[in-house]
């Protein structure tokens, strides 16, 4: 079904050795374009939701059966062996929406319970292969899928887990290093747990007008990004960068400065101006956010460089748990050039300089292991495992 294959390792310490301290250019007056939107710009969810028709689902089902008949491994799913002749053009256009227009879309209509977990995952990978040709690693052990859930089987106290493995609210952030963030909704929450998106450009424009010193602080490459709990290593990078005419964000409040779990460390704490700038852009993101009412079976794809995301706290049902499956994707043709100061986590996800196993866990493992570092983090960890130690890897063959 979803067996291992190979790709490059996460040699992030080598990737992080030569980063200039200050890459800030002159402040612009404003960032304009289709990515500079406000949640109020969207009258309803039909504006950004692609509702599949019956014939569309039939085409996807036929592609699934065609792929399974080939006897290939799940990791081999791509646009060549998952044929969608009628949907391909619109999926290609949706990839352009992510990179060149509003930056996101929701695909709806695959919520039927007729799919097994394996088939549902294969469909997710197959459709995603039309959006982007590369799937990134999400931890140092090579996991390509991560499960964002709070399993009822886990006994480890919630304060000792990653934030994505809890029911708590997560602040606005990016998944550092990811180009396109994709989420498959396996099951929604009983109450709450909404996903929110917010335009980095719109939030930044507010700072340019009202707090230019905060905008300058975010563009300055002196933010300490912790990359390991063992030895407490970090590199310096900007929270925002203007590169090739695009505003790009690499913000995770839980990775800036020393993490509480690290103990005594030489990693610098955030300065007062950095703390203020982080608070200001977060508040601006809240003011202009868009709430997504995602349904079971939905697929969400968005530009992780251009949009911040967060979620509400939530309550699960007695017998159900909110469950999303995450992919990190890159489109080799449309993907944005990444500034050198933001390369370390990107290189960790997409780099090719050695041999590494790629794993596709289908469900979370019942026995949750306490992470070595960054319990409570909203996004991934670069060196210590975010998913590999707490998810079971199902290695099987497609029937």
Write out the residue ranges for each language-model feature.
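Active-site environment of non-heme Fe oxygenases that use a 2-His-1-carboxylate facial triad
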Residues: 2-94, 100, 105, 112-114, ...
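A short alpha->loop->secondary-structure connector
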Residues: 124-134
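Internal, non-catalytic "lid/hinge" segments that mediate substrate recognition, gating
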Residues: 136-139
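"Short basic amphipathic alpha-helical interaction patches in structured regions
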Residues: 118-125, 198-199
């Amino acid at each position: 079904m979803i067996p291992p294959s190979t790709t490059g390792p996460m040699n992030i310490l080598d990737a992080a050795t030569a980063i200039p301290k200050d890459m800030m250019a002159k402040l612009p007056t404003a960032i304009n374009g289709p990515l500079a939107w406000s949640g109020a710009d969207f009258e309803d969810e039909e504006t950004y939701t692609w509702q599949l028709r019956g014939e569309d689902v039939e085409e996807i089902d036929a592609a699934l059966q065609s792929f399974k008949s080939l006897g290939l491994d799940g990791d081999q799913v791509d646009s060549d062996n998952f044929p969608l002749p009628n949907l391909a053009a619109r999926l290609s256009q949706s990839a352009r929406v992510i990179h060149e227009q509003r930056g996101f879309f929701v695909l709806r209509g695959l919520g039927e319970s007729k799919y097994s977990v394996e088939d549902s995952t294969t469909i997710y990978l197959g459709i995603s292969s039309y959006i982007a040709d590369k799937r990134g690693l999400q931890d140092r052990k090579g996991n390509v899928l991560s499960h964002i859930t709070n399993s009822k089987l886990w006994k480890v106290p919630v304060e000792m887990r990653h934030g994505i493995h809890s029911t708590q609210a997560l602040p606005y952030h990016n998944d550092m290093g990811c180009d396109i963030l994709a989420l498959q909704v396996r099951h929604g929450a009983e109450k709450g747990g909404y996903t929110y998106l917010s335009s980095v450009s719109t939030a930044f424009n507010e700072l340019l007008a009202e707090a230019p010193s905060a905008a300058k602080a975010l563009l300055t490459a002196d933010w300490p990004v912790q990359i390991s709990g063992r030895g407490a290593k970090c590199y310096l990078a900007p929270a925002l960068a203007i590169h090739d005419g695009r505003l790009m964000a690499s913000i995770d409040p839980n990775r800036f400065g020393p993490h509480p779990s690290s103990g005594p460390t030489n990693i610098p704490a955030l300065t007062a101006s950095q703390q203020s700038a982080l608070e200001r852009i977060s508040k601006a993101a809240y003011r202009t956010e868009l709430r997504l009412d995602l349904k079971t079976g939905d697929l969400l794809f968005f530009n992780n460089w251009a949009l911040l995301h967060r979620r509400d706290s939530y309550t699960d049902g007695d017998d159900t748990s909110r469950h999303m499956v995450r992919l990190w994707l890159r489109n080799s043709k449309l993907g944005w050039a990444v500034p050198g100061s933001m390369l370390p986590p990107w290189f960790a996800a997409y780099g090719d300089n050695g041999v590494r196993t790629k794993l596709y866990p289908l469900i979370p493992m019942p026995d949750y292991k306490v992470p070595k570092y960054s319990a409570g983090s909203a996004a991934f960890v670069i060196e210590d495992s975010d998913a590999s130690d707490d998810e079971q890897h199902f290695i099987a063959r497609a029937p």
